Amino acid sequence: MTTLQERVAAHFAESIRAKQEAEKILVEPTVQAAELMLQCLMNDGKILACGNGGSAADAQHFAAEMTGRFEKERMELAAVALTTDTSALTAIGNDYGFDHVFSKQVRALGRAGDVLVGISTSGNSANVIEAVKAAHERDMHVIALTGRDGGKIAAMLKDTDVLLNVPHPRTARIQENHILLIHAMCDCIDSVLLEGM
């Protein structure tokens, strides 16, 4: 029987391996995603972010890093988590269905050149799929953070979008990589804005 200590150690080991595997395939796409967001922000655009459950928390975490700061003081950057307005979420969910809680907000707030960050560990979250459709209707770019095989969202993306897919079967490991990717993108943005890299 495995001890609790062994279980915890196994989480560390698996998380490290998952990050090492992700590094092999996601460094360049992460830079592309950061550059896409920078281009949007430099053109007075905004970034909208959405997801469900832990991915909703990641969307909020990302927006907070943008509007506040990541690790260094800098100007505020326009980012909105579509997961925080309970009145909008419940009204849209009640009147149109849960699949549309993000897409209605994307249509209301999104403009051509803006960026949608859609987060779904399965790549199959119906409301994130609808948000991607709405973003494309608005001529927005999409950065999709997904897991496993990328799901339906990966298949929807255009050449001008960026897929950050973590090909791991466990949701916890995918989520851990997603927050690492979010932090890496924030760092890239800050490096360009503050250091001219």
UniProtKB/Swiss-Prot annotation:
GO cellular component, one term: cytoplasm
Phosphoprotein listed as a keyword: no
Stored InterPro entries: GmhA/DiaA, Phosphoheptose_Isoase, SIS_dom, SIS_dom_sf, SIS_GmhA/DiaA_subfam
Residues reported in the UniProt entry to bind Zn(2+): H61, E65, Q175, H183
Cofactor: how and how many bound: Binds 1 zinc ion per subunit.
Pathway: Carbohydrate biosynthesis; D-glycero-D-manno-heptose 7-phosphate biosynthesis; D-glycero-alpha-D-manno-heptose 7-phosphate and D-glycero-beta-D-manno-heptose 7-phosphate from sedoheptulose 7-phosphate: step 1/1
Family membership noted in the UniProt record: Belongs to the SIS family. GmhA subfamily.
Function per UniProt: Catalyzes the isomerization of sedoheptulose 7-phosphate in D-glycero-D-manno-heptose 7-phosphate.
Entry protein name: Phosphoheptose isomerase
Gene: gmhA
